[in-house]
């Protein structure tokens, strides 16, 4: 079974998808944002969109996406196993933002401000598996963020998050990408 997928960025900020490999130290050194998600690699319909937005991100908004395999179990056992996989990718001083439909709603400018406020730390965005995450991982999270009251497929959440990170970067830069 595939251990995980990683999307590191080069020094220029351009991304590439590497299957089953560890990120290079030089790629990690420039990273400030990591998206950790559970599930399969990107479906054909989502890959171009995620790629488009992640490749446009520049430091300090540069991001990597780590796709961890989903559990072969169901229910509580799956939630526990997947949360442990996520925990193994976190550092004790990470600023953790968990995406969950029961979280707090943030506008795009609020997200941009939140990232900018914590950009001196490593920021980890977490997209849990189909059964969610454990209460321990929820408590480790600094913010629980809801994209909407609606529930979305995980593939779509990855795309929305990638676009929102790009939008946050552009709001921070003062560009005309975001119209409010």
Where are the language model's segments positioned?
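Short, positively charged low-complexity motifs
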Residues: 1-6, 20
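Short, Lys/Arg-enriched N-terminal segments with co-localized hydrophobic residues
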Residues: 16-30
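S-adenosyl-L-methionine/SAH cofactor-binding core of RNA-modifying enzymes
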Residues: 61-63, 67-124
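N-terminal beta1-alpha1 ligand-phosphate binding loop
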Residues: 31-53, 57
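Short glycine-rich anion-binding loops that position phosphate/pyrophosphate groups of nucleotides
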Residues: 41, 101-104, 129-132
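Structured adenosyl-cofactor binding patch, chiefly the S-adenosyl-L-methionine
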Residues: 135-179
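Short hydrophobic segments within beta-strands
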Residues: 36-38, 66, 126
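Short, surface-exposed alpha-helical segments at coil->helix boundaries
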Residues: 47-54, 80-83, 135
């Amino acid at each position: 079974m595939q251990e995980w997928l990683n999307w590191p960025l080069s020094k220029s900020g351009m991304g590439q998808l590497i299957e089953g490999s560890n990120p290079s130290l030089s790629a990690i050194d420039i990273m400030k944002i990591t998206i950790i998600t559970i599930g399969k690699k990107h479906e054909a319909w989502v890959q171009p969109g995620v790629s488009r937005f992640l490749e446009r991100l520049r430091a300090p908004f540069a991001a990597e996406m780590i796709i961890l395999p989903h559990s072969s179990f169901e229910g509580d056992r799956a939630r526990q196993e997947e949360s442990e996989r996520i925990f193994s990718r976190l550092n004790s001083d990470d600023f953790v933002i968990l995406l969950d439909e029961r979280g707090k709603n943030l506008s795009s400018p609020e997200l941009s401000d939140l990232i900018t406020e914590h950009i001196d730390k490593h920021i980890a965005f977490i997209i849990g598996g189909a059964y969610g995450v454990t209460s321990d991982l929820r408590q480790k999270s600094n913010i629980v963020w809801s994209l909407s009251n609606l529930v979305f497929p995980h593939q779509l959440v990855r795309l929305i998050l990638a676009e929102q990170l790009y939008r946050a970067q552009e709001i921070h830069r003062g560009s005309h990408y975001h119209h409010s």
